[in-house]
Amino acid sequence: MEDLFGRIMLDIEGTSLTNDDRSILSNSQVGGIIFFSRNFESHNQIKGLISEIKSIKENIIFAVDQEGGRVQRFKNDFTLMPSLQDLSKYSDANKIDICKEVAWLNSSELLAVGIDVNFAPVLDLDESSSSIIGNRAFSSSSEEVVKFASSYIDGMHEAGMRSTAKHFPGHGGVIEDSHISLPEDIRSLDDLFNSDLKPYLELVNKIDAVMCAHVLFSNIDKFIPSYSRLWIDEILKNQIGFDGIVFSDDLTMIGAGNDDFFEKAYNSVLAGCDMTLICNNRQEAINAINHFEEMGVEQSNKILRMKKTKHIDWNDLAISERALSVKKHLQNIRS
């Protein structure tokens, strides 16, 4: 039987499943779950929750934002990770490839509890203007971002996790936070190819997935990337040559627009997104699921590519010499 996955990724409210959760998870249009801090208590709890969900549905991927620094959903039991920018500075100062090692440890911990996807690394440039990116980015230099992100992705792959580059084509050049507004970037496509898009061009053969930015590039297209065939089909796939998975960012963010959620979700799929995220609004997620069923949205076998390729047991990881070595470096970064 072909491994088909639904095209909607959604969230759950707490640390255990409700009857409503069990009902919606059984729907064929649901192909992914993203976890937040509210869903997490310990590594044993999240592992048990994932096992329970898998007993309801096998063809589903589990995702989290575990970049490090400001964005780390799982903390208790997990290694506290520094921001990507702190990693790059430490790596340069000490002439060591710490990005690869930290990515390996971060990915290994997530894989050990059943997480398939960490939405990382951030490929945005820190242009000292964005209120939401900042030190989530490796650097302000596209060359530096390529160098450090390449190592980071190598570490993810060694652990058995696929990479997800974000936020395509770039969120670092705008001031506004797309969670609470729609940022507008007036640069030309040539400008972007000479800056923000360079990491995607250089790393296209390493990147497994891309998450789209909720930013309006008004001199390039009237649609944000998640709804844009120009951005996804023409620029990302044809011009850059990307052949991986495309995720929308969360459609409940203000930057995703004011249309009905089922229209936003459907438009993202029409534009070329393989999976669309609807978080923190269960009723609208249900509406989108119903609309997908009415419109005959087909499940996808591409999502299978994002499943983990291997993993190390949690207890074995705890005593791994490699893990202990990485943790020593992390103590130095924090000190």
Predicted regions span which residues?
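Glycine-rich, aromatic-flanked loop segments that form ligand/cofactor-binding clefts
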Residues: 54-82, 99-125, 145, 153-169
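N-terminal hydrophobic targeting/anchoring segments and the immediately downstream early-domain regions
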Residues: 1-62, 66, 70-78, 333-335
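Divalent metal-dependent hydrolysis catalytic cores, especially in the metallo-beta-lactamase
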Residues: 32-38, 116-122, 272-276
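Glycine-rich anion/phosphate-binding loops
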Residues: 41-48, 90-108, 140-148, 190-194
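Short glycine/serine-rich loop/turn segments
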Residues: 118-140, 169, 173-185
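Second-shell residues forming the walls of enzyme active-site clefts
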Residues: 10-11, 38-53, 72, 150-157, ...
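Short, acidic/polar
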Residues: 12-27, 98-109, 194-200, 260-267
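Extended, intrinsically disordered, low-complexity segments
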Residues: 294-335
